[in-house]
C-alpha cells in the first residue's frame, strides 16, 4: 500500500485523481490548488458557477473551508450528526475560499465520507479533496476504475482501483441550517 500512497501523494500535488465514493467514482484534486481545480473543471466540461463538493475523513479537514462560527450552537448537533455518511451538507463558507469551489455562493458543499477507501485517501493525504462525479457533464458517472480510464484516458493522473460503496444514487445534498434539499437520495 505504501507505493499506492506514494503515487497518490505525487499525483495530488498538481494533478487530478479518481477514487471510489459511496455510489460512483469521483474525480478530485487538492482544493488549495486553483490550477488543478481549473483543470478539473475543464476536463469535466463543468461550469465554474456550479461549484464543487469537498470530501474529508473528518470535520477538522473541512474547517479551512467552512465558517464554523456561523453555525449556531442549536444547529451544531443537526449538522454533525449526518457524518460520517452519504450526506453532503451546504454550509457557510469561510472568507477567502476560492469561488471555483463555491460557484460564487456564500456556502460550500462538504461531506465527511463514510466510504473507507475515500476516507483513507483523505486521511493519508492529510486534507480534504474536491469531489465531483467521474463523468463528462451530461454523461453517466463511472462506477469502476476501468470506466474512469475509458472516459478520461491519460487525463487522470492517478486512479484508486477500489470498489464504490454500492449505493444506487449519489449522495443526498441538504442545507441543515434551513432544511433545503438540493438533491434527494431517492
What are these regions (language model features)?
Residues 1-186:
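Active-site-adjacent structural elements in enzyme catalytic cores
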